[in-house]
Structures are given as structure tokens and as C-alpha cells.
Amino acid sequence: MMTIQRIFSKPLLNKIVILTGLVNGFLLWSLSVHAVDSPIKSDEVIIFLPEVGYPLADGKQWNLHVHGWIYEPDWSSDFSIAFRTLFGLEEYRLEEEKYESIAQERRKLFFVDNEGGKRIPIRIGAKIFVLDQSGSNGHFYGNLLVTAPEVEQWQDKATHTIPFTAITRENDNRQFSGKIYLLDAKGVSVISDIDDTIKVSEVHDKKALLANTFSRPFVPVPQMAQFYQQLATQEPGTTFHYVSASPWQLYPALTEFLETYHFPLGSFHLRLFRWKDSSFFSLFQSPQPHKIETIEHLLQWCPQRRFMLVGDSGEQDAEIYAMIARKYPERIVHIFIHEVPRQNGNKLDYREVFKGIPTTQWTVFTDATSLLAK
């Protein structure tokens, strides 16, 4: 019997083998994409919340964090009256009506049907990952162990991020995209509060805070965007992480704020909030546990990186950052505190707050213009 080697020359046979391998590879990729049973229904929406990825100790693998939220919007209900009454915004009714489109946009994610029990598949490059099951609050997570060559292949070098998309059902052409901010083993990370640090919130006045959060256009703290842009260019690989007690429902509005006023983009670390469980009370509790836990995680994930901490005097940022600086003295490059009015009218005794921390390691300012001159 005549063998295949006698029919084809060796060079031609090699080309056939290579071509066959490529075709099979493509078919396997196609099958792997379409074989995934996407649980995302046509009336459900996903928001991916920007997370971080970092190399493990050996440098050969990276841990990529993914965080998303799946829910069904409720476009029919008007919760204006209930929302104003619950949060004491009745006196801002006329102002809210003036900015009705803003108020409606900010409120709508507080009144959605969260979808639990969903395992969302995502595609990074040509690879498929199925994430952990979503909880009753609709939030889902994933820690993906990948190789350094994969990170090199997948990353967008202009933004130093890895983009990805959710896999939807056949005939569902919607695209739900997210990104993972990559933290090199060494470099500087800027951890920033939001309220009264980069955005005027008036935390000391609870009614003004609620109106600034839910009814009024967001206003930047003067010159802070320029200061952050300056920090971003001081050292290559500088990253930004926005750690706030604000609820995740405000993420779309907050990221639009960053883009509008040209703040550097970065990962977000906000608080979970849901009407139906104890997280409802998180809006009225101290931000300290959430902020400390988040900052310590970033420090532990990236043991060779150095950190700048930026906050304000209105909500325990100075005390939290001082505690972190004492615990990790070699890791904290500098602390910046924006001094704002406090509820009791008293100013912090900063020398007491930062006792034991060199004065060269912390700065208190009322006008960010003074920081631009440094």
C-alpha cells in the first residue's frame, strides 16, 4: 500500500501538518467559545468594576482580579419620593428637579433586581475563564492565575491594562467589557479617597453630602486633577487606586467624573450596599474597616511597591493613613491630607495624629495649588 509520505513530498507534508494544526486550533477555539453556556439573559446587564493584577513572588505567574455586577434594570418605577424621604432630601426637591436627569441616573442602580447564582464566562485574548458564582447582591469575583507570557500577550501597553469581555448568548450582540490594571512588582501606587479629596462632597454636612452625592453635578476639588497628573508622570508605572466609602452604585457616575475632569483612571474599591441586608447600614457607618482592609490587601499583594496615600480631614483618613504608615514605615512614600471643615468645627491635632512619623513624610494642605509648586 502506498504511504502518504510517498504521495506527498516531505516539505509539502510538513506544510499540510502545520496548516492542519492551525485549522484544528481555530476550530477548538471556536468550539470553546460557543460551547460555554452563558447565563446572561437578554434583560440582564453586567458592569465590570476595574480591578488589579500583580505578579506572584516567582515572577512567572500573575494573579488577575476580576469583579463584576449582574442585575436586571427596573426602568419603569419612579422612586423619587421614597428616595428623598429616606435620605432626608425633601428640602432639595426643587434643586433635584432642576437636575432631574442627574438625579434619576444616580438613583437607578439602587433599585435594580440583583441576579444571584450566575457564573459569568469572560474572554481574555483567546482564553475563556468562568468566574465564581454571583451572590445575592449580584456581585461576582474571580482570581485568575495566568503566566507572565500571557500577560505580556494580552496587555494593552498604552494603558498597562488587560481588557476582557463577557461571553453572551448566541444572537446577543451586546458587549460587556472590563479591564484589569496591572501593577508591576516595583513602582509607586497612589491610594486616593474620593469625597472631599478629589470631589467636593461636604461630608461634614450630612444633608449637603446627600445632595452632592445624589442630586447635584459632581464638582472637583480645585487643582487636584493637575496634582494627580503630576504624580502620574513623576515615576514610570505609577498607578491609582480609588478607595472610598461610597457605594458601588455610584461607580458609573464616579468614573465619568474622573474622565470629565482628567483624573488618572485606576482601580476602584467601593463599599457594597443593598437595601435587603445589613449592608444598607454601611452608608452610615465608619469607613475605617473598609479602607484599612483594602489598603492592606494592596500592600500585601505587591510587597515591593511603594505607596502614596491621599485623603482629607473629614472622615478619618488622617488617622487611618497614620496607622498604615506606622505599620509599614518603609512602604509609605508620603501622606497628603486635604484639610476640610469637620462636623464639630475643631481641627485635627496633626502632630498628635502623626506622632512618631517624620514631618517630611506627611503634608496637610487647604489649597492643592501649593502641592503643584513642590
Model regions and ranges:
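Asp-based phosphoryl-transfer active-site loop
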Residues: 189-201
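Short, acidic loop-to-helix structural element flanking the phosphoryl-transfer center
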Residues: 214-238, 248-252
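Short, surface-exposed connector motifs at secondary-structure boundaries
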Residues: 233-241, 300-307
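N-terminal secretory signal peptides that target proteins for export/translocation
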Residues: 1-13
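Bacterial N-terminal signal peptides
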Residues: 17-28
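Intrinsically disordered, serine/threonine/proline
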Residues: 31-179, 370-374
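C-terminal cap/substrate-recognition subdomain and adjoining C-terminal extension
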Residues: 38-39, 246-374
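Short beta-strand edge segments in extracellular beta-sheet folds
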Residues: 179-185
